[in-house]
Amino acid sequence: MKNSEATLRIQGKIISIRGQVAEVEFPEAKPRLRDVIVLVDDPSTQMELYAASIRNTYYCVVLSPTSRITRGARVINRGSSVTIPAGKEVLGRVIDAFGNPIDSKGIIETTEHIPIYRSPLGYHEIIPKSEILDTGIKIIDLFCPLVKGGKLGLVGGAGVGKTTLLTELIHNIVILREEENAISIFAGVGERTREAHELLETLTLKGVLPRTVLVLGAMGEHPAIRFRTAYTAITLAEYFRDTMKKNVLFFVDNMYRFAQAGNELSTVTDVIPSEDGYQPTLTSEMATVQERLMSGRGGMVSTVEAIYVPNDDVLDQAVQSIFVYLDSIVVFSRDIYQKNFLPAIDILESHSSALTPDLVGEKHYTAAFQAQSLLKKAVKLERIVSLIGESELTPEDRILYKRANILRNFMTQPLYVVEDQSHRPGIYVPRQKTVEDTVRILAGEFDNYTPDEFLYIGTTENLHAKRT
């Protein structure tokens, strides 16, 4: 009798349905946010409590087909949040936001399930960053290095090469370097299914899929699915870090879509937006995912995030909410892309807190600082050249202007993942070699070469081959 009374206390009923959101009334016991609500007559139909509505009523995001739900249907609070399968059995698999396999390889046979909502590490548990992770991409390694255990953001508008460079980073770090004791996790949040399929084929072909997990919530999915895809992927990263004691390489495309999905959810649940049009909980939602991507005693979590910039406006509030968590910010430029300087990265707009003598070394730090100074001078000289021509510059300025163009062209690089489109074989350049070549360019060793000879070469050793 007591059990039946307890069940009645946590029962409720559906009073309205709008798309993927159901309004549920619990007249007595109040459920907790993120509790899973199921139909009494069909426990396989699940909802997640998202927000409070009015007295004793709550908005629930439907996680199953809405065709199963009707007004007046009785529901029961399961008393726990969404869980996903974990363990070594998920390696090599492609799953959705709820841990269901979507790769036609059958069910994931594991007895271990973990909730997707967890608290981040405490301050005393976080391991400081002290090592640079080489990417083999000159412009990133020199100006915006990826810290092992840190976060790097690829920031840009549509069609400027963010996903291409993200895929190249996966290729260089996961496939070429084959980091020891490392697991790779790719979170596809609100992006194209085609890109995830191409990545899956590449990982399978190169034989690294068994050390990788892909978590996908494509752009065609409901915002509730896209929103939870990020949590699922991060939960797996934490599991491999803390339980399996592995280093984790975490890639997400696209973090802006996570913020966008949260905004769409707040709209359908009648939440009044903030002044900039986004959900008022944007900052806290971003914190719940970013602060969990930390390195602990179990292992390091190194993160690369593609970040879409709507209307090429870097000051967009969703974009700004991500910036505060990044160690290195790589900014893409449409103007540079149209000039065919690839990767189309704006060196002077990009920056990194990891670019310090303690982390990268004195030689690297000095080379990067001097290179940025030279490029800044070249911007001023460019204005003069556009008005009166290069011949009107002083001899000293003419040398600096040419040297800056040599340096800018040297930062272009053929990428492995677009070899079939560019018809140029990809090149991996060690970070120390990039620093050495930059020092030589700044010293004027190559002033007798033309800037065009530095386009899409790997190192300065390739100059002779290009001339012949």
Predicted regions mapped to residue ranges:
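Acidic-enriched and Gly/Ser
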Residues: K2-I10, I17-T135
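Residue-level signature of catalytic and energy-coupling elements of molecular machines
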Residues: I14, G19, G72, V94, ...
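P-loop NTPase nucleotide-binding/switch module
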Residues: A73-V75, V82, E89, I102-G150, ...
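Walker A/P-loop NTP-binding active-site region of P-loop NTPases
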Residues: F143, V147-T202
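Phosphate-binding/switch loop-helix module in NTP-utilizing enzymes
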Residues: A224-G262
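Conserved catalytic/coupling modules of large nucleotide/cofactor-utilizing molecular machines
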Residues: T235, R257, T267-T468
